[in-house]
A protein has these predicted regions:
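Conserved AMP-binding/adenylate-forming
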Residues: 1-44
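Structural core segment of the AMP-binding/adenylate-forming
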Residues: 4, 32-99
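Conserved S/T- and glycine-rich ATP-binding loop of Class I adenylate-forming
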Residues: 12, 30, 61, 121, ...
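Helix N-cap/beta->alpha junction signal
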Residues: 16-19, 64-65, 120
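A hydrophobic alpha-helix adjacent to the NAD(P)-binding/active-site core of NAD(P)-dependent oxidoreductases
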Residues: 52, 85, 116, 147-150
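Conserved pre-ATP/AMP-binding loop-to-beta segment of ANL
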Residues: 87, 105-126, 133
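Structural motif detector for alpha-helix initiation sites
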Residues: 97-99, 118, 141
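Conserved AMP-binding A3 loop
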Residues: 122-148
């Protein structure tokens, strides 16, 4: 994440068709450094990606296979905050998530992880927007802990 310029408080989009290990690994990396995950439905339109990524100020977005890269990249020119789209699957010469996995920033990662507080924002989950634009639901680390403990 740090190699992508992602740091504490930055928003990172995630779009995949199915649950997969890469999603979990990426989501944990996001939370570990104090960044904020923004999962998005794979079935929404480019216009809806544009709306969500602008509202959340998504900096980097990880996408799965198929048309997801194309749909997100259509919105990229209208999302000032979005600097990079990363693929979980090989898709031509597009950036691949494994290109950014390394241990060169371990000390910085550990330092950042120690600063994450339970009341820090962990994720913003968007509703389906059946009566208008999708609405973001902001969840802290404590919200997630409470669900796990119950």
């Amino acid at each position: 994440m740090l190699d992508l310029g992602v740091g504490p408080g930055d928003k990172v989009g995630l779009v995949v068709y199915k649950n997969r290990p890469e999603w979990v690994i990426t989501d944990l990396a996001i939370q570990y450094i104090g960044a904020v995950g923004v999962p998005m439905y794979p079935t929404i339109s480019s216009r809806e990606y544009e709306y969500i990524m602008n509202e959340a100020e998504v900096k980097v977005c990880f996408v799965g296979m198929g048309d997801l890269y194309d749909k997100v990249s259509l919105a990229q020119s209208k999302v000032e905050s979005l600097k990079k789209i990363i693929c979980f699957d090989k898709q031509g010469g597009r950036p691949l998530w494994t290109d950014f996995i390394n241990d060169k920033n371990l000390e910085q990662v550990e330092s950042l992880s120690q600063k994450v507080k339970t009341d820090d924002l962990a994720t913003i989950i968007y509703t389906s927007g059946t009566t208008g634009n999708p609405k973001g639901v902001m969840l802290t680390h404590q919200n997630i802990i409470s669900v796990v403990e119950s």
